[in-house]
Amino acid sequence: MATIHLPPDFKEFLKLLNAQQVEYLLIGGYAVGYYGYPRATADMDLWIGMNPQNAKKIVTILKEFGFDIPDSSIEVFMKPNQIIRMGVTPVMIEMMTTISGVSFEECYPHRVKDELDGVEVNLISLRHLKINKKAFGRHKDLDDLENLP
């Protein structure tokens, strides 16, 4: 696996997710790099499991991370097809509630737990990442597919 360096804000956010036992998966460019095709990425993509406990934990973490958000924001993390963006590239975090081609319930039990830059991370499995990339079908996703093992 490739050596991956994470910006300090990414590391801090991942540590908060882990401390609160949030159900999440690292997807996107960082996952592609982990599986052997390092490439430039403008953000860290996280797929968040949609359930009430997870949603409450995320809102708590966002407040701890310095965002002033109302408790009613919990509802955003309970709706499909949501993308929540924080920060600006290249240190932007995107949290998604749905991704193409796979379900969270199917992927989470098969997650890969590993350490990136000293932080424990839950990654989408290679098989599920490939299914997602194929289903999403953008040019960069198809390029990722060609270069993944």
Indicate where each model-derived feature is located.
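Compositionally biased terminal segments of proteins
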Residues: 1-149
